[in-house]
Amino acid sequence: MESKVRGEEERQKVERLVEKLKVHNNNNNRSSTPAHISFVPNSIVVSSRKLAAAFWEFHQYHYKDEEDCSYSYLSSASAKMHRGPNGFAGASSRRQRHGKAVAVKENGLDLSQFLRDPSPDHQPDSAGSLRRQIGQMLIKHHQSIDRNNHALQPVSPASYGSSLEVTTYNKAVTPSSSLEFRGRPSREPHYNLKTSTELLKVLNRIWSLEEQHVSNISLIKALKTEVAHSRVRIKELLRYQQADRHELDSVVKQLAEEKLLSKNKEVERMSSAVQSVRKALEDERKLRKRSESLHRKMARELSEVKSSLSNCVKELERGSKSNKMMELLCDEFAKGIKSYEEEIHGLKKKNLDKDWAGRGGGDQLVLHIAESWLDERMQMRLEGGDTLNGKNRSVLDKLEVEIETFLQEKRNEIPRNRRNSLESVPFNTLSAPPRDVDCEEDSGGSDSNCFELKKPAESYGDETKKPNQHNKDGSIDEKPKSPSSFQVNFEDQMAWALSSNGKKKTTRAIEDEEEEEDVKPENSNNNKKPENECATTNKNDVMGEMIRTHRRLLSETREIDEASCNFPSSRRQASPVRQWISRTVAPDLLGPSEIAIAHGVKDNTLKTKLANSSKSRLRLFKG
């Protein structure tokens, strides 16, 4: 029972000590790093087996001692320990224990001293000295335990949960307390000394176990402190690791961002390069299209220029050919004019000087132009020049004044010839149409009379003033004019009609002038006889109607020729003798009066004679 009570008290004491250590650990928050277990010098490993065997022996001896020993023996033994015969043994033993305790504190726990029996040298001399020594040792032991409890601070309450089980010990013996052994009387002194020795041995074991427990607790506390320090270090390392991990994550993230940025920059650079290349290709395609369009346009223009050049070359060739043809034609005309002049000169020698007296100036001018042309052409042939190198222009320049003079003279001569030709027609002397025999004779001699030109106006005036000659018997002798005179007058009218195209007169104006001119002879012949007037009027009407009809036909043909001039030169290259082709009157173009007259006149009429005279003139120019 007492052992149980003591065990409970020891547990309560241990719990109070644990609470004190908790409070002290909570108040002391500073970190301390105790020495590692490897730094404890002369550390002795104690097996739990030996401890258990020692505890078992102690308990067996303790219970046996309680049964066999008496209280008197214990009291006598304690008295001997207090008294001591000499008093030196207790001091020496106390010094030995103190030195042993110091050695335990300095060198660690030595269980071999407690597990083997002590030598006989260390046994106490007397019981009093032993008692005093035990009391001092207990006091020092408790003080050392208290100091160790205050010095060693456990980290956690689990520090007391050691695997080593320490046996409970009784309450420490103090010097004030006396060992009271009651019950049995003391026995033999030798036995008491042996009991004291055994008790001292037990106490030494208990103290050694307590010191071992304290050292184990300190070791456990050191280990737990080391564990705590390790935990702190681990936490710090974990914190460092976490910081390093965060830094590594940030570095990885930064690297990823930089990689993404570099990739984006590369993509942008590639896209910009592709865009620039695409733009360059677009510009190149536009330029190529434009160049192709320009090439097509230039090719088209070149083809047009080539075609125009070929046309110009063809035109030049045609112009050169036409110039050559015109030159040849002009040469032929000049030769014809010269031969015509020679023939006219031969005709002048046949008593026709009076008929050609008024027409010598114009013929001389034409002859002069023809001779000048032939001379220039001959000079060009001698020099070996071409007609396209400007020599022809020089000929035209040289003959320009003479040609203009000739044309002006012709323009001035046409109205005068026209008036003289109209006045030269003896309309009043015509009394009746000629007979058939006379017509045949006149038609036979018309070839020679067709070349007669108009006579001076004075001769025609004399004839008109004296149309009727009186015979000796007083009768009027009417001299009918021959058809040759009518032929000459009609040829003069035709020449005037042909030359009137240069002045661009209309047919209506010409008809009005003819009517006015027809009125003048009528007014001048009002004093004639009525019968003569009727005959003359009928003849004049027939002649005027024929002239007007012929003029109308000529004007229509000239309009057709002028319209044909608008066509290309290749289509209007007419024959050089076209002007001398006879123009016959179509029946549908004649009026009713002309048709009636035509039916009443035979083939040997004036129209037939005019046609024959035109043919003879053509033969003359060709021959």
UniProtKB/Swiss-Prot annotation:
InterPro entries in the record: BLT-like
Basic and acidic residues bias: start-end ranges: 452-481
Chain spans, region Disordered: 417-485, 497-536
Swiss-Prot/TrEMBL keywords:
Coiled coil
From start to end residue, where is composition biased (Polar residues)? 422-431
Coiled-coil ranges from the UniProt annotation: 256-351
Q: Domain of life, per the record?
A: Eukaryota
A cellular component term from Gene Ontology for this protein is: chloroplast
Q: What is this protein called?
A: Uncharacterized protein At5g41620
